[in-house]
Amino acid sequence: MERAIFAGGCFWCMVQPFEEQAGILSVRSGYTGGHLPNPSYEQVCAKTTGHTEAVEIIFDPKQIAYKDLVELYWAQTDPTDAFGQFEDRGDNYRPVIYYTTERQKEIAEQSKANLQASGRFDQPIVTTIEPAEPFYLAEDYHQGFYKKNPKRYAQSSAIRHQFLEENWS
């Protein structure tokens, strides 16, 4: 089994696309990249911890390749926005691919270069690629949010889905 960590704005919106793929064993919402151990949602939202909202994915590389996860990640984000994603603004929502191995780093960097060269976007691809840091699990009410609160999830993800439809379909 391997581990992947992606930050792409609100973690509620990052779970379902990965969870629906064959070879995914778990997708958990949490916080990473900051300086405060075991932060709470309120602390991360206060923008003083340095953490981003992210998802940790445990996957079987025999069933789904890391490269495919990176491609799926791009299609969930606006890779030209370094200051958050969609209606969620600030460092705690910035887009980051966290790599856990040098091979993941190489794959992510090549994928980013390919996306930039594709001309899909008029602006530079600004998503950062950074070494993984400790991942702190978010509170239970955040886990599987799209299943627990489908109406609220639909409302909170509407702007994201419109962008994805216009730019990734």
Swiss-Prot record:
Q: Which reaction does it catalyse?
A: L-methionyl-[protein] + [thioredoxin]-disulfide + H2O = L-methionyl-(S)-S-oxide-[protein] + [thioredoxin]-dithiol; [thioredoxin]-disulfide + L-methionine + H2O = L-methionine (S)-S-oxide + [thioredoxin]-dithiol
Protein's recorded name: Peptide methionine sulfoxide reductase MsrA
Annotated catalytic residues: C10
Gene giving rise to this polypeptide? msrA
Task: Name the InterPro entries on file.
Answer: Met_Sox_Rdtase_MsrA_dom, Met_Sox_Rdtase_MsrA_sf
UniProt keywords (A-Z) are: Oxidoreductase
A single BP term in Gene Ontology: protein modification process
Catalytic class of the enzyme: oxidoreductase
Q: What is the similarity comment for this entry?
A: Belongs to the MsrA Met sulfoxide reductase family.
